[in-house]
């Protein structure tokens, strides 16, 4: 038996001419507006944000390429495309510029991990090559660190206090391998990346692409 609900979709709106308007230009603009209103500025020391026009950025973290658009299950709907943080910044080339060396490094690393069969959101933070770090610092004095987290219907953020509570969700077990103290905290690899970037750059911004 196949599960069919095509005739029972009260959330499939129709336009005045009877055509579906889901994913229309109007809906895309509405989604963009909702995303903007859902962003929260947690801290802005020395008024580093917003970036001045012409700012050069060295973007660090696998989250620059591994964009989390929603949680697992019904929260992660099928879409025609997504825009990663890296691609989004590049689309603003009239305003900021991104160091291409790091962009290529993270995009390739994330792509390679998924080709090896890594589950969504379970990619591991790669170590930044010393030579690449040196070139990025020569490019700019401003770094942008990206961190992402994925959650789903059967599991959510965990901490070291949750180690004794096991979920039946397979992804929960995968998460324990990647995030040593639970994914409320930085993994060891993420912590090393953050400390490395902080030591090399005088100006650092952190972007959290997280759910839960």
Question: Language-model features: where?
Answer:
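C-terminal non-catalytic regions of proteins with extracellular/luminal or membrane-system context
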Residues: 1, 6, 11-212
